[in-house]
Each structure stands twice: as structure tokens, then as C-alpha cells.
């Protein structure tokens, strides 16, 4: 199949690279936006080197591409809304905004989409951790910005709990 479409991928990590490989295999051209010039997608696609929240870089990507997508949720939704043309980001930014906050995401999945989710508790400060039962295991996660294990703390012991207090208050 041959295509003259250009796909823009925000994020040039391993997932972005795999998306690019698939798109190229189908005959598309790919341009990725990533802060690292040597990101994995750079091996197969043209790269615009800029932070994910750089509106000028997002605009440049949007102007050069027929369609846009993103490889992860830590993308500037407001910036995307400011630069995309109608239909250029088929998935839109509504679900992106929901996925950027774990509290919103859990609420959406359990209450709106009626998906069964694991039990959870919203923690807004270390005071919310004061009465947890250390005979059980917990994973404290930041509501925003976490990825690949960053912004998480597994709690098994009193020592873990002390570290979790700092994360909860951040």
C-alpha cells in the first residue's frame, strides 16, 4: 500500500518507534516530536527536537502532518487544542485530559464507563496514610506526571510509609 500521508507522533520513545515502524511499513511518512534527538523513534523517523509542551514545536508538527497521535499521556492537551486542525487528532484531547490524572481516570472508568477497577483510595496528604494497615500491600501513586514507575511508592513497612509521606505531601 502506498500513501502520501504524514503521521505526526508526539513522543519518540519505544512505543513511538514501534508506531512509526508500523506506519512506515504501511507506506506513510512519520515525524515525531521528542525532547531527545537520539530517542528510539529517531532511528526510523524524522524528529523535531523540543519539549512536549512547546506550542511552537507542536504547531510545526501539526502544520507538517496530516494526522497526529501521541504515545503517552504526558502531552500538553491545551497546546494540542491550540494547534490542531479539525479532524487532525481523531482521538481528540478529552480522553487525554482524563488519562493525565489518575483520580479522574479511575472515576471515569468506574463511574462513567462502568469498568471494574481495583480498590483504591484518593490520598491528598500524608494524613490520609495515617491509619493504613501495614499487613496489606499498597502502591501510592501521584495523581499526575508519573510514568514507568516514577511517582510511585510500594508500601510494605513502616520505613516505606515514611517515604510515602513525602510523596503524599508533594
Predicted regions and their residues:
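Short acidic-hydrophobic, aromatic-tinged amphipathic segments that line or gate anion-handling sites
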Residues: 47-52, 121-125, 154-156
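Short, glycine/charge-rich beta-strand/loop segments that flank catalytic centers
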Residues: 93-100, 121-128, 145
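Acidic/polar active-site rim loop that often engages polyanionic ligands
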Residues: 88, 109-115, 141-149
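Conserved ATP-binding module of the ATP-grasp superfamily
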Residues: 115-118, 138-140, 153-170
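General beta-strand structural signal in soluble alpha/beta enzymes
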Residues: 70, 89-91, 119-122, 140
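Amphipathic, non-transmembrane alpha-helical secondary structure
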Residues: 55-59, 63, 81, 126-130, ...
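ATP-binding N-terminal substructure of ATP-dependent carboxylate-amine bond-forming enzymes
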Residues: 1-100, 104-107
Amino acid at each position: 500500500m502506498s500513501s502520501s500521508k504524514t503521521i505526526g507522533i508526539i513522543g519518540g520513545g519505544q512505543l513511538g518507534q514501534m508506531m512509526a515502524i508500523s506506519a512506515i511499513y504501511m507506506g506513510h511518512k512519520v515525524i515525531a516530536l521528542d525532547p531527545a534527538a537520539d530517542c528510539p523513534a529517531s532511528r526510523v523517523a524524522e524528529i523535531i527536537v523540543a519539549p512536549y509542551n512547546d506550542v511552537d514545536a507542536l504547531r510545526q508538527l501539526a502544520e507538517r502532518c496530516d494526522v497526529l497521535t501521541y504515545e503517552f499521556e504526558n502531552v500538553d492537551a491545551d497546546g494540542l487544542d491550540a494547534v490542531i486542525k479539525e479532524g487532525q487528532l481523531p482521538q481528540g484531547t478529552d480522553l487525554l485530559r482524563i488519562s493525565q490524572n489518575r483520580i479522574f481516570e479511575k472515576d471515569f472508568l468506574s463511574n462513567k464507563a462502568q469498568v471494574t477497577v481495583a480498590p483504591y483510595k484518593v490520598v491528598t496528604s500524608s494524613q490520609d496514610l495515617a491509619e493504613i494497615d501495614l499487613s496489606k500491600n499498597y502502591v501510592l501513586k501521584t495523581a499526575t506526571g508519573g510514568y514507568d514507575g516514577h511517582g510511585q511508592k510500594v508500601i510494605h513497612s513502616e520505613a516505606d510509609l515514611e517515604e510515602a509521606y513525602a510523596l503524599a505531601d508533594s
